[in-house]
Amino acid sequence: MTPGARVAAAIGVLDAWLSGESIDRALTGWARGARYAGSKDRAAVRDLVFDAVRRKGNCAAFGGETGRGLMLGHLRLQGQPPEALFTGEGYAPAPLSATEQTPPAVAHDPWRDVPGWLRPTLRADLDVDADPIVEAMQHRAPLYLRVNERKANVELVEESLVKDGIKTTKTDLAGALAVVENARRLRQSTAYLTGLVEIQDLSVQIACAAVGWPPSGRILDFCAGGGGKTLAIADRSAASLFAHDAVPVRMTDLPARAARAGISCTLLATDDLPRHAPFDAVLCDVPCSGSGTWRRDPEAKWRLTPDRLAELGQLQRQIVTDAARLVAPGGRFVYMTCSLLRAENEAVIEDTLLARGWTLLPTRRYTPLDASDGFFLTEMQHSGQIATGP
Protein backbone atom coordinates (compact mmCIF):
# COMPACT_ATOMS: atom_id res chain seq x y z
CA MET A 1 0.00 0.00 0.00
CA THR A 2 1.14 3.53 -0.73
CA PRO A 3 1.24 6.09 2.09
CA GLY A 4 -1.84 7.72 0.59
CA ALA A 5 -3.71 4.42 0.51
CA ARG A 6 -2.88 3.86 4.17
CA VAL A 7 -4.32 7.27 5.02
CA ALA A 8 -7.48 6.44 3.05
CA ALA A 9 -7.82 3.15 4.95
CA ALA A 10 -7.41 4.97 8.27
CA ILE A 11 -10.14 7.43 7.24
CA GLY A 12 -12.53 4.54 6.64
CA VAL A 13 -11.73 2.96 10.00
CA LEU A 14 -12.14 6.29 11.81
CA ASP A 15 -15.51 6.89 10.14
CA ALA A 16 -16.66 3.46 11.35
CA TRP A 17 -15.45 4.31 14.86
CA LEU A 18 -17.22 7.67 14.81
CA SER A 19 -20.39 5.81 13.81
CA GLY A 20 -20.22 3.71 16.96
CA GLU A 21 -18.01 0.70 16.19
CA SER A 22 -15.10 -0.09 18.47
CA ILE A 23 -11.65 0.59 17.05
CA ASP A 24 -10.72 -3.09 17.09
CA ARG A 25 -13.91 -4.12 15.31
CA ALA A 26 -13.47 -1.38 12.72
CA LEU A 27 -9.84 -2.37 12.09
CA THR A 28 -10.78 -6.05 11.82
CA GLY A 29 -13.57 -5.24 9.37
CA TRP A 30 -11.19 -3.24 7.20
CA ALA A 31 -8.48 -5.92 7.29
CA ARG A 32 -10.92 -8.65 6.21
CA GLY A 33 -11.83 -6.65 3.14
CA ALA A 34 -8.24 -5.65 2.38
CA ARG A 35 -6.53 -8.98 1.76
CA TYR A 36 -3.92 -7.12 -0.28
CA ALA A 37 -2.66 -5.37 2.86
CA GLY A 38 0.49 -6.88 4.33
CA SER A 39 1.42 -6.96 8.00
CA LYS A 40 3.36 -3.69 7.72
CA ASP A 41 0.37 -2.04 6.05
CA ARG A 42 -2.00 -3.23 8.77
CA ALA A 43 0.39 -2.02 11.47
CA ALA A 44 0.76 1.38 9.78
CA VAL A 45 -3.00 1.85 9.44
CA ARG A 46 -3.49 0.85 13.07
CA ASP A 47 -0.87 3.38 14.19
CA LEU A 48 -2.54 6.15 12.16
CA VAL A 49 -5.93 5.34 13.68
CA PHE A 50 -4.68 5.15 17.27
CA ASP A 51 -2.67 8.36 16.89
CA ALA A 52 -5.76 10.19 15.62
CA VAL A 53 -7.99 8.84 18.40
CA ARG A 54 -5.38 9.64 21.04
CA ARG A 55 -5.40 13.28 19.90
CA LYS A 56 -8.95 13.42 18.61
CA GLY A 57 -9.67 16.87 20.05
CA ASN A 58 -6.66 18.49 18.40
CA CYS A 59 -7.00 16.51 15.18
CA ALA A 60 -10.59 17.74 14.88
CA ALA A 61 -9.53 21.32 15.61
CA PHE A 62 -6.88 21.15 12.88
CA GLY A 63 -8.92 19.24 10.30
CA GLY A 64 -12.53 18.44 11.15
CA GLU A 65 -14.80 16.01 12.98
CA THR A 66 -15.01 13.30 10.29
CA GLY A 67 -12.55 10.50 9.64
CA ARG A 68 -11.11 12.55 6.79
CA GLY A 69 -10.92 15.60 9.02
CA LEU A 70 -9.16 13.69 11.81
CA MET A 71 -6.51 12.39 9.41
CA LEU A 72 -6.08 15.84 7.90
CA GLY A 73 -5.58 17.25 11.39
CA HIS A 74 -3.22 14.43 12.35
CA LEU A 75 -0.95 15.13 9.38
CA ARG A 76 -0.88 18.83 10.17
CA LEU A 77 -0.01 18.13 13.80
CA GLN A 78 2.81 15.87 12.59
CA GLY A 79 4.13 18.63 10.35
CA GLN A 80 3.37 16.63 7.20
CA PRO A 81 1.89 18.48 4.20
CA PRO A 82 -1.50 16.79 3.70
CA GLU A 83 -1.67 17.69 0.02
CA ALA A 84 1.19 15.25 -0.59
CA LEU A 85 -1.06 12.35 0.48
CA PHE A 86 -4.53 13.69 -0.38
CA THR A 87 -3.91 13.41 -4.12
CA GLY A 88 -6.81 11.32 -5.41
CA GLU A 89 -4.30 9.16 -7.27
CA GLY A 90 -4.70 5.40 -7.03
CA TYR A 91 -6.22 4.62 -3.65
CA ALA A 92 -5.25 7.91 -1.99
CA PRO A 93 -7.93 10.22 -0.53
CA ALA A 94 -9.49 12.84 -2.79
CA PRO A 95 -7.56 16.12 -3.13
CA LEU A 96 -8.15 18.83 -0.57
CA SER A 97 -11.08 21.13 -1.21
CA ALA A 98 -10.59 24.88 -1.27
CA THR A 99 -11.84 25.05 2.32
CA GLU A 100 -9.54 22.25 3.48
CA GLN A 101 -6.49 23.86 1.91
CA THR A 102 -6.50 26.66 4.49
CA PRO A 103 -5.36 25.48 7.93
CA PRO A 104 -7.52 26.76 10.79
CA ALA A 105 -6.07 29.54 12.92
CA VAL A 106 -5.81 27.50 16.12
CA ALA A 107 -2.98 26.55 18.46
CA HIS A 108 -2.26 23.06 19.70
CA ASP A 109 -3.67 22.49 23.21
CA PRO A 110 -3.11 19.09 24.90
CA TRP A 111 -6.18 19.64 27.10
CA ARG A 112 -8.38 19.35 24.00
CA ASP A 113 -7.58 15.65 24.12
CA VAL A 114 -9.17 15.24 27.55
CA PRO A 115 -12.99 14.96 27.66
CA GLY A 116 -14.32 18.41 28.55
CA TRP A 117 -16.34 17.29 31.57
CA LEU A 118 -13.25 15.68 33.12
CA ARG A 119 -10.77 18.54 32.68
CA PRO A 120 -11.45 20.40 35.97
CA THR A 121 -11.25 17.17 37.99
CA LEU A 122 -8.07 15.97 36.31
CA ARG A 123 -6.41 19.36 36.69
CA ALA A 124 -7.26 19.45 40.40
CA ASP A 125 -6.16 15.85 41.02
CA LEU A 126 -2.84 16.18 39.19
CA ASP A 127 -2.11 19.64 40.65
CA VAL A 128 1.23 21.08 39.53
CA ASP A 129 1.93 18.07 37.32
CA ALA A 130 -1.31 18.39 35.36
CA ASP A 131 0.04 20.16 32.28
CA PRO A 132 3.17 18.01 31.80
CA ILE A 133 1.21 14.78 32.38
CA VAL A 134 -1.49 15.72 29.88
CA GLU A 135 1.23 16.69 27.40
CA ALA A 136 2.99 13.34 27.93
CA MET A 137 -0.29 11.53 27.24
CA GLN A 138 -0.25 12.92 23.69
CA HIS A 139 2.33 10.34 22.71
CA ARG A 140 2.49 6.58 22.30
CA ALA A 141 3.27 4.56 25.42
CA PRO A 142 6.53 2.59 25.59
CA LEU A 143 6.35 -1.20 25.72
CA TYR A 144 7.99 -2.96 28.67
CA LEU A 145 8.85 -6.56 29.45
CA ARG A 146 9.20 -8.30 32.80
CA VAL A 147 11.94 -10.90 32.85
CA ASN A 148 10.86 -14.14 34.54
CA GLU A 149 13.76 -14.41 36.95
CA ARG A 150 12.77 -17.96 37.82
CA LYS A 151 13.85 -19.05 34.34
CA ALA A 152 16.36 -16.50 33.05
CA ASN A 153 18.33 -13.34 33.69
CA VAL A 154 18.21 -10.08 31.77
CA GLU A 155 21.31 -10.81 29.72
CA LEU A 156 20.01 -14.19 28.55
CA VAL A 157 16.68 -12.64 27.57
CA GLU A 158 18.35 -9.80 25.68
CA GLU A 159 20.43 -12.30 23.70
CA SER A 160 17.36 -14.37 22.87
CA LEU A 161 15.36 -11.35 21.74
CA VAL A 162 18.19 -10.07 19.54
CA LYS A 163 18.16 -13.38 17.68
CA ASP A 164 14.52 -12.66 16.84
CA GLY A 165 15.35 -9.13 15.72
CA ILE A 166 13.95 -7.42 18.83
CA LYS A 167 16.03 -4.69 20.45
CA THR A 168 15.60 -3.76 24.12
CA THR A 169 17.24 -1.52 26.69
CA LYS A 170 17.57 -1.95 30.44
CA THR A 171 15.58 0.22 32.85
CA ASP A 172 16.28 1.42 36.38
CA LEU A 173 14.25 -1.53 37.69
CA ALA A 174 16.11 -4.82 37.74
CA GLY A 175 14.34 -7.36 35.57
CA ALA A 176 12.50 -4.81 33.41
CA LEU A 177 13.32 -4.14 29.76
CA ALA A 178 12.02 -1.49 27.37
CA VAL A 179 11.37 -2.63 23.80
CA VAL A 180 12.81 -0.11 21.35
CA GLU A 181 12.70 -2.00 18.05
CA ASN A 182 10.41 -4.57 16.39
CA ALA A 183 7.89 -4.77 19.24
CA ARG A 184 5.36 -6.46 16.95
CA ARG A 185 7.58 -9.53 16.69
CA LEU A 186 7.48 -10.09 20.42
CA ARG A 187 4.59 -12.56 20.70
CA GLN A 188 6.29 -14.85 18.19
CA SER A 189 9.70 -14.64 19.85
CA THR A 190 11.34 -17.58 21.58
CA ALA A 191 11.70 -15.61 24.82
CA TYR A 192 7.95 -14.92 24.96
CA LEU A 193 6.78 -18.36 23.86
CA THR A 194 8.99 -20.13 26.41
CA GLY A 195 7.94 -17.91 29.34
CA LEU A 196 11.20 -16.00 29.75
CA VAL A 197 9.34 -12.68 29.53
CA GLU A 198 5.87 -11.23 30.02
CA ILE A 199 4.54 -7.97 28.61
CA GLN A 200 3.92 -5.68 31.59
CA ASP A 201 4.04 -1.93 32.02
CA LEU A 202 6.88 -0.51 34.08
CA SER A 203 4.52 1.04 36.65
CA VAL A 204 3.01 -2.36 37.43
CA GLN A 205 6.43 -3.96 37.75
CA ILE A 206 7.65 -1.21 40.08
CA ALA A 207 4.48 -1.44 42.16
CA CYS A 208 4.65 -5.22 42.51
CA ALA A 209 8.31 -4.95 43.49
CA ALA A 210 7.53 -2.29 46.10
CA VAL A 211 4.78 -4.17 47.95
CA GLY A 212 5.71 -5.91 51.19
CA TRP A 213 4.40 -9.33 50.16
CA PRO A 214 4.57 -12.01 52.85
CA PRO A 215 7.55 -14.28 52.08
CA SER A 216 5.40 -17.38 52.60
CA GLY A 217 1.81 -18.25 53.41
CA ARG A 218 -1.06 -17.57 51.00
CA ILE A 219 -1.71 -14.65 48.65
CA LEU A 220 -4.97 -14.02 46.76
CA ASP A 221 -5.22 -11.93 43.58
CA PHE A 222 -8.90 -11.01 43.92
CA CYS A 223 -9.35 -9.31 40.50
CA ALA A 224 -6.85 -11.45 38.64
CA GLY A 225 -7.99 -11.03 35.04
CA GLY A 226 -5.26 -12.43 32.80
CA GLY A 227 -2.98 -12.92 35.80
CA GLY A 228 -0.12 -10.58 34.99
CA LYS A 229 0.22 -9.40 38.57
CA THR A 230 -0.24 -12.93 39.92
CA LEU A 231 2.81 -13.98 37.91
CA ALA A 232 4.76 -10.90 39.01
CA ILE A 233 4.10 -11.69 42.67
CA ALA A 234 5.67 -15.12 42.14
CA ASP A 235 8.99 -13.37 41.49
CA ARG A 236 8.72 -11.63 44.87
CA SER A 237 7.31 -14.27 47.23
CA ALA A 238 7.36 -18.02 47.82
CA ALA A 239 3.76 -17.90 49.08
CA SER A 240 1.06 -20.12 47.59
CA LEU A 241 -0.80 -18.13 44.94
CA PHE A 242 -4.57 -18.03 44.41
CA ALA A 243 -6.43 -16.17 41.67
CA HIS A 244 -10.07 -15.11 41.46
CA ASP A 245 -12.12 -12.95 39.14
CA ALA A 246 -15.81 -12.08 39.29
CA VAL A 247 -15.91 -12.85 35.55
CA PRO A 248 -14.06 -16.19 35.41
CA VAL A 249 -13.64 -16.13 31.63
CA ARG A 250 -11.11 -13.33 32.10
CA MET A 251 -8.78 -15.91 33.68
CA THR A 252 -8.97 -18.26 30.68
CA ASP A 253 -5.34 -17.68 29.68
CA LEU A 254 -3.94 -17.71 33.22
CA PRO A 255 -3.29 -21.47 33.57
CA ALA A 256 -1.32 -21.56 30.31
CA ARG A 257 0.62 -18.41 31.21
CA ALA A 258 1.45 -19.80 34.65
CA ALA A 259 2.58 -23.11 33.19
CA ARG A 260 4.74 -21.33 30.64
CA ALA A 261 6.32 -19.29 33.43
CA GLY A 262 6.84 -22.35 35.64
CA ILE A 263 4.46 -21.10 38.34
CA SER A 264 1.76 -22.90 40.32
CA CYS A 265 -1.48 -20.98 40.86
CA THR A 266 -4.89 -22.13 42.11
CA LEU A 267 -7.94 -20.57 40.45
CA LEU A 268 -10.92 -19.97 42.73
CA ALA A 269 -14.58 -19.38 41.93
CA THR A 270 -16.43 -16.81 44.04
CA ASP A 271 -18.27 -19.54 45.95
CA ASP A 272 -14.93 -21.15 46.86
CA LEU A 273 -13.47 -18.07 48.55
CA PRO A 274 -14.94 -18.48 52.07
CA ARG A 275 -13.57 -21.98 52.59
CA HIS A 276 -10.09 -20.99 51.38
CA ALA A 277 -9.94 -17.80 53.45
CA PRO A 278 -8.23 -16.22 55.26
CA PHE A 279 -5.23 -15.11 53.21
CA ASP A 280 -2.03 -13.48 54.40
CA ALA A 281 -2.35 -10.87 51.65
CA VAL A 282 -5.11 -9.93 49.23
CA LEU A 283 -4.48 -7.87 46.10
CA CYS A 284 -7.30 -5.89 44.50
CA ASP A 285 -6.45 -4.34 41.13
CA VAL A 286 -9.99 -3.07 40.67
CA PRO A 287 -11.87 -2.19 37.47
CA CYS A 288 -11.41 1.53 36.86
CA SER A 289 -11.53 4.30 34.27
CA GLY A 290 -8.10 3.28 32.98
CA SER A 291 -7.19 6.97 32.81
CA GLY A 292 -3.55 6.11 33.45
CA THR A 293 -3.47 3.94 30.32
CA TRP A 294 -5.14 6.30 27.88
CA ARG A 295 -1.98 6.54 25.80
CA ARG A 296 -2.28 2.81 25.22
CA ASP A 297 -6.09 2.67 25.02
CA PRO A 298 -7.17 6.13 23.79
CA GLU A 299 -10.66 4.96 22.89
CA ALA A 300 -11.43 4.47 26.59
CA LYS A 301 -11.25 8.17 27.44
CA TRP A 302 -13.89 9.05 24.86
CA ARG A 303 -16.19 6.28 26.15
CA LEU A 304 -15.98 7.38 29.78
CA THR A 305 -18.96 9.36 31.12
CA PRO A 306 -19.74 10.91 34.51
CA ASP A 307 -22.33 8.20 35.12
CA ARG A 308 -19.86 5.44 34.30
CA LEU A 309 -17.25 6.95 36.61
CA ALA A 310 -19.82 7.02 39.42
CA GLU A 311 -20.74 3.37 38.72
CA LEU A 312 -17.07 2.41 38.90
CA GLY A 313 -16.74 4.16 42.25
CA GLN A 314 -19.58 2.11 43.70
CA LEU A 315 -18.13 -1.10 42.28
CA GLN A 316 -14.66 -0.33 43.65
CA ARG A 317 -16.04 0.25 47.15
CA GLN A 318 -18.00 -3.00 47.04
CA ILE A 319 -14.97 -4.98 45.83
CA VAL A 320 -12.76 -3.55 48.58
CA THR A 321 -15.36 -4.35 51.23
CA ASP A 322 -15.82 -7.92 49.99
CA ALA A 323 -12.12 -8.65 49.50
CA ALA A 324 -11.01 -7.21 52.83
CA ARG A 325 -13.10 -9.82 54.64
CA LEU A 326 -10.75 -12.45 53.25
CA VAL A 327 -7.59 -11.04 54.86
CA ALA A 328 -6.22 -12.80 57.94
CA PRO A 329 -5.85 -10.73 61.12
CA GLY A 330 -2.54 -8.94 60.83
CA GLY A 331 -2.55 -9.56 57.08
CA ARG A 332 -2.07 -7.11 54.27
CA PHE A 333 -4.53 -5.57 51.82
CA VAL A 334 -3.12 -4.15 48.58
CA TYR A 335 -5.22 -1.79 46.45
CA MET A 336 -4.21 -0.91 42.89
CA THR A 337 -5.69 0.98 39.95
CA CYS A 338 -4.42 2.22 36.61
CA SER A 339 -6.22 5.52 37.27
CA LEU A 340 -5.00 9.07 37.75
CA LEU A 341 -8.21 10.13 39.49
CA ARG A 342 -8.49 10.66 43.23
CA ALA A 343 -12.11 9.48 43.15
CA GLU A 344 -10.90 6.00 42.23
CA ASN A 345 -7.83 6.00 44.44
CA GLU A 346 -7.56 7.75 47.82
CA ALA A 347 -11.30 8.39 48.06
CA VAL A 348 -12.15 4.69 47.80
CA ILE A 349 -9.79 3.71 50.60
CA GLU A 350 -10.87 6.62 52.79
CA ASP A 351 -14.53 5.65 52.42
CA THR A 352 -13.98 1.97 53.17
CA LEU A 353 -11.03 0.58 55.09
CA LEU A 354 -9.69 3.71 56.78
CA ALA A 355 -13.07 4.02 58.48
CA ARG A 356 -12.88 0.43 59.73
CA GLY A 357 -9.71 0.19 61.76
CA TRP A 358 -7.12 -0.46 59.05
CA THR A 359 -3.69 1.18 59.14
CA LEU A 360 -2.48 2.93 56.00
CA LEU A 361 0.94 1.77 54.82
CA PRO A 362 2.91 3.29 51.92
CA THR A 363 0.97 4.86 49.06
CA ARG A 364 2.63 5.30 45.68
CA ARG A 365 1.61 7.00 42.46
CA TYR A 366 3.16 6.68 39.04
CA THR A 367 2.43 8.83 35.99
CA PRO A 368 3.61 9.11 32.38
CA LEU A 369 6.28 11.45 33.74
CA ASP A 370 7.85 8.30 35.21
CA ALA A 371 8.04 6.82 31.67
CA SER A 372 5.17 4.50 32.58
CA ASP A 373 1.40 4.33 32.68
CA GLY A 374 -0.48 6.16 35.39
CA PHE A 375 -0.84 3.82 38.37
CA PHE A 376 -1.87 3.96 42.03
CA LEU A 377 -0.88 1.63 44.86
CA THR A 378 -1.67 1.62 48.54
CA GLU A 379 -1.07 -1.03 51.21
CA MET A 380 -3.09 -1.44 54.38
CA GLN A 381 -2.81 -3.64 57.42
CA HIS A 382 -5.03 -4.49 60.37
CA SER A 383 -3.29 -5.31 63.63
CA GLY A 384 -6.06 -7.40 65.14
CA GLN A 385 -9.55 -8.66 64.41
CA ILE A 386 -10.60 -7.20 61.08
CA ALA A 387 -13.78 -5.15 61.09
CA THR A 388 -15.07 -5.04 57.54
CA GLY A 389 -18.80 -4.93 58.01
CA PRO A 390 -20.98 -2.09 56.78
Where are these regions (language model features)?
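S-adenosylmethionine
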Residues: 1-390
